[in-house]
Amino acid sequence: MASNPPLDLTLTPTKGDGRTLEQWFTTFHLVSVVVDPFTNESAWILDTAARILRDFAGAAVRVNWVVTGTAEDARAFLGPLASEFLTFADPDRSYVSALGLQHLPAFVFLRVDGQVVAVAEGWNASEWREVAEAIADTVVWSRAVIPAPGDPQAYVGTPALV
């Protein structure tokens, strides 16, 4: 079960200085895809997740990756996706732990007040679609098509905390 993270938790982008969640929330909700750069399960979802993040890029949300590794790990794992989207490094998994995530990859929607609105862990198209619908309803945006041709079959993912 996901939990609301503390607003004083610092998220550090791969480029730039870290800021607290409260500072990241000054204008936009956070829509994160959380991945582990050391697992196949997270690699399998990159194309699908990038497509979904692109669908919300123009909405009143801050779309981003959270990579459970260093900034270098994030850039190596995501390649050009690390530059296309805001990317946070979470090498000690403090953000993952604060959210109470059990499996990665995960799709997380946090409102500007820091409340978890919706979470999907592992890859299950219907669960990710529910998160996308919660985002679309909140910001009055078009719904992402999930699943789309080429998306992987459902899988549980890997343990979020190791």
What residue ranges belong to the model's regions?
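Non-globular targeting/processing and membrane-anchoring segments
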Residues: 1-30, 44, 54-62, 75-81, ...
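Thioredoxin-like thiol-disulfide oxidoreductase module
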Residues: 68-104
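Conserved redox-active cysteine motifs that mediate thiol-disulfide chemistry
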Residues: 34-48
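Structural signal for short hydrophobic segments within the conserved structured cores
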Residues: 86, 117-120
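Short pre-active-site segment immediately N-terminal to redox-active cysteine/selenocysteine motifs
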Residues: 28, 35-38, 70
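Short internal beta-strands
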Residues: 62-68
